[in-house]
Amino acid sequence: MAGGNFELVALGNPLLDMQIRNGEAMLEKYGLKPNDAVLADEKQLAIYQDLVDNYDVTYVAGGAAQNAARCAQYVLPANSTAYLGCVGKDDLAKQLQAANDKEGLKSIYQFSDDQPTGSCAVVITGHNRSLCTNLGAAEKFNKSHLDTAEAQKAIKNAQTFYLGGFFLTHGVESALVLAEEAKTRDVSLTMNLSAPFIPQFFTAQVDQVVPYADVIFGNETEAAAWAEAHKLESKDLKTIAQAIADFDAVTAKAQARVVVITQGSQPTIVAKRGETQQYVHETPKINPADIVDTNGAGDAFAGGVLGALVLGKTVDEAIEVGHKLGGMCIGQVGPILKFPKENVL
């Protein structure tokens, strides 16, 4: 595969992460769980200024699908990835663009006139991370942006699309445009469940997109939320992964759907549509002393898997690459990888 054609195009919510450590008091104050992701309610909107006033904040480029796309680019030739999302006309957007430029991800942003770039409070406690998001401009993404010349060029070249589950809270119409494009051209549509509240409260939107998807990522809590939303009685992760794999399929590629469920340091589970046996991939052991924080580890894993699949690797080989990038990410502050690049293929 030659680089330069934007083989992978991701769609999601571009956010600037505002990360703090030792945030136990913040969890209690704002009613957050240690290892969760939520959209900020009215009471929680005060958290962003609170962090700035009372903590040493580290600012890092975030947004789950944007993180995954940057991590996919890490293993791909130059100019292989592009990202679609909506930002404000502000300094936060410039910071996101600069991070993407540095790591070789092409930003095809829509700009909102009246909303600031979205932000995400990342509260680190021990090896856990709690995410509290104010979408801002991100939820102003308009389907018309997909028709712009720059977006069309990337979309028509894409061999793989990646949808962040978070995007489905407001952008299912845009997601379905890419899903239909994937179906028409028989290319890959991949997606991430992203957080328990997505399959739990946006079940209808998830169920609209899943039939087009041939690779679906999630973690153990997201899989459990999907099972509950679909009245699946089993709590067994292999059974749940298989149920997601066997869900409706409307494209040729989705007929061979692969579902990948991570569970932190525990083995990664893989289910393939129509099969009776699931596969278990051991996660490389990491010394707890080497863990800086886990923010973005799941995105790094997904990005590694996607990048490897775009390169034509098998699912097993791709998961190995994903584990390497996830392991690398938790040794850094925030959702970033080591530079100069290390060969993980």
Please annotate each region the language model reported.
Residues 1-21, 34-35, 180-184, 228-345:
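Conserved phosphate-binding/catalytic region of the ribokinase-like
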Residues 103, 108-112, 120-168:
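Conserved phosphate-binding/catalytic loop of the ribokinase/pfkB sugar-kinase fold
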Residues 1-82, 94-95, 291:
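Glycine-rich phosphate/adenosyl-contacting loop at the front of the ribokinase-like
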Residues 85-89, 106-117, 241-246, 259-263:
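Beta-strand->loop->alpha-helix junctions that form or flank phosphate-binding loops
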Residues 160-242, 266-268:
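Conserved beta-alpha-beta core of the PfkB/ribokinase-like small-molecule kinase fold
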Residues 151-156, 209-210, 253:
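A short, aliphatic-rich alpha-helical micro-motif
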Residues 11-13, 85-89, 112, 124-126, ...:
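Cofactor-binding loop segments of dinucleotide-utilizing enzymes, especially the Rossmann-like FAD-
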